[in-house]
C-alpha cells in the first residue's frame, strides 16, 4: 500500500450506484489508506475535505491480499486508524496501468501535494518499498478515482499537516 493506496475486503458484498442512489441494503467495503498512523490520518483528512479524489494501489498487493479490483459504482467507506467509518466514497473510474504510465491527471486528482510526476512516483515508491513491495516501470498500478459521499462524523476529524507525514509512520 502506498500513499493513497487502498485495501478492500474481498468478502464484503459490492454496492452499486445506480441513477444517483445506493440500494438501502448496500454494504460498502472498507477503504483503508496506507497504514494506521499519521499518513492515514492525513489522507483521510484530504478525502473528507474534498481534496483527495483518487488513490493508487499495487496490483501485486491486490493479488497477495486476495482483494477484488474496484469497479465503477462501488461504494466504499473510508475508515480511520481504528477501522471506524469516516466517510463514504463512490468509485467513478478505474484504470490498471504500468507505473511508468501514470498520468498527471491522476496525480492532480490524488491531490497529495506533488508538483511533478517524478515527485509523485518517488513518494509512492518509497512507501511501497517500505512495506516490502519492489516496484519498477513495469509494475502494474490500480488507479481509482472516486467522489465523496456521506461524511459519518459530526465532530472534528483529526488532521495531520503534510510535514508530519513520513513514509515510515
What are these regions (language model features)?
Residues 1-88, 94-169:
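Mixed-charge, low-complexity intrinsically disordered regions
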